[in-house]
Amino acid sequence: MKNQQTVPPTGGQGGLDNQQTVPPTGGQGGSKVVVAFSGGLDTSYTVMKLKEEGYDVYAACANTGGFSEEQLKKNEENAYKLGAVKYVTLDVTQEYYEKSLKYMIFGNVLRNNCYPISVSSERIFQAIAIARYANEIGADAIAHGSTGAGNDQIRFDMTFLVMAPGVKIITLTRDHALSRQ
């Protein structure tokens, strides 16, 4: 198959040895991939690259309350410019607050007695929203822009594996070992 992509195993040392093949067929009707889209460099690259490889790219921004309306509008414009066939904002602000954030506030939960631990907890809610959306539209794959440097990759990968078990996980930034050099 000419345009077939082999997705390297995710998780590295974590043992998630699930090398997968997702054949893009290009254009409307190709393999659907949902990109967890923040509008940053890594997810913008992911949208553009997967479009070039023939995927039908669905960009989804899971908003836990950190994006302004202006930024969400800019994300939508950029997603379409990069080649997404659809863009959605998944508002999980209330769910995140009700199920997690308010308890961290009540408990004054801080990392190293200094930093709110909200970033790590919000990733799970973002990943859940992305997985739900991928299941809703019958996506073949989910992509995210996490690098191999932090724990976000694990939060996304594990949530996707549990919530969307038949869906492939694509992580171009990590798998291509992209850097600024």
Task: Briefly describe each language-model feature range.
Residues 8, 16, 178-181:
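Short, intrinsically disordered, charge-balanced linker/junction segments flanking boundaries
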Residues 1-9, 13, 23-24:
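Intrinsically disordered, low-complexity proline-rich tandem-repeat tracts
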Residues 13-14, 38:
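Short linear motifs centered on Gly/Pro in flexible linkers and helix caps
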Residues 2, 21, 25-181:
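ATP-dependent adenylation/nucleotidyltransferase module used to activate substrates
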